[in-house]
């Protein structure tokens, strides 16, 4: 079997909030759980409460059993909030087709699922997509769904700027956190550099933030924990999650 390490992604890493963070951990409010009737207001509230970036879930109804958000939605939010950092998480079968549209819409980071990279050439296709994403001016991440064995990501771990570990089965917000994600975080942290971000998505909140950070995560994508409380309470939620890094 040929070595994946002999065929690295050739593009230069992008410098942004994720790859060169002003602080760790980073808190990424996930707008999937926001009130869509006032989405702009919700996003501003999350940033004003201390969120570092906005996690933007995209679903096509094929890779995952739900539909959510899209290019035009991100473009509208970016136009209204030009200083906000958008972390686009593409839970779709053809991330290669949508990399450029999301870059043009204003995404600063794009994560695609390894489950979308099928076949014998999955590693090569994944590395090529990482190059494409960086060539468009975005940092590049890979995501692993909850039921997927973490070893399936081995061919791409060393090439991505970020590894996103789903602590649920991708598709719906509000699911319970699966503790097996902690072992996946440890597995990845042992195999990537200190500058590679590890993001966790699904059931994330103050109750498990300390465990996630201790395992090696440094980006927490929180949906219901942030958006299912009132705006004044969001400051406390984000502060608690960030404070978990020091045990406070």
Where are these regions (language model features)?
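Active-site beta-loop-alpha junctions enriched in small/polar residues
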Residues: 30-34, 59-61, 91-93, 115-117, ...
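N-terminal amphipathic alpha-helix/helix-capping segment at the start of soluble metabolic enzymes
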Residues: 2-33, 40-41
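C-terminal helical cap(s) of enzyme catalytic domains, especially alpha/beta-barrels
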Residues: 213, 227-248
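Hydrophobic faces of well-ordered beta-strands that scaffold small-molecule active sites
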Residues: 26-30, 54-56, 77, 86-90, ...
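Conserved, mostly hydrophobic/aromatic
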Residues: 39, 46, 57, 102, ...
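Glycine-rich, proline-tolerant flexible connector loops at the mouths of alpha/beta enzymes
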Residues: 54-71, 114-121, 168-176, 230
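A structural motif
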Residues: 48-51, 107, 160, 217
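Conserved anion-binding
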Residues: 38, 83, 97-101, 107-197
């Amino acid at each position: 079997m040929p070595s994946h390490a002999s065929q690295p992604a050739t593009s230069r890493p992008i410098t942004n909030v994720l790859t060169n963070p002003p602080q760790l951990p980073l808190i990424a409010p996930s707008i999937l759980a926001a009130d869509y009737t006032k989405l702009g207001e919700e996003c501003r509230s999350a940033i004003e409460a201390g969120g570092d970036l906005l996690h933007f879930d995209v679903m096509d109804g094929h890779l995952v059993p739900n539909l959510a958000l899209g290019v035009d939605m991100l473009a509208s939010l970016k136009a209204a909030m030009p200083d906000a950092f958008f972390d686009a998480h593409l839970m779709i079968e053809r991330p290669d087709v949508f990399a450029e549209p999301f870059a043009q819409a204003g995404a600063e980071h794009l994560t695609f699922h390894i489950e979308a990279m099928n076949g014998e050439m999955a590693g090569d296709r994944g590395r090529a997509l990482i190059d494409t994403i960086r060539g468009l001016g975005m940092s590049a991440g890979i995501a692993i769904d909850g039921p997927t064995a973490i070893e399936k990501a081995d061919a791409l771990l060393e090439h991505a700027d970020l590894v996103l570990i789903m602590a649920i089965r991708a598709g719906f917000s509000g699911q319970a956190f699966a503790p097996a994600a902690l072992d996946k975080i440890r597995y990845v942290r042992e195999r990537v550099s200190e500058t590679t971000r590890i993001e966790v998505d699904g059931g994330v909140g103050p109750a498990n933030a300390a465990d996630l950070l201790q395992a090696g995560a440094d980006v927490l994508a929180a949906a219901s924990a942030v958006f299912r409380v009132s705006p004044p309470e969001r400051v406390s939620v984000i502060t608690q999650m960030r404070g978990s890094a020091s045990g406070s």
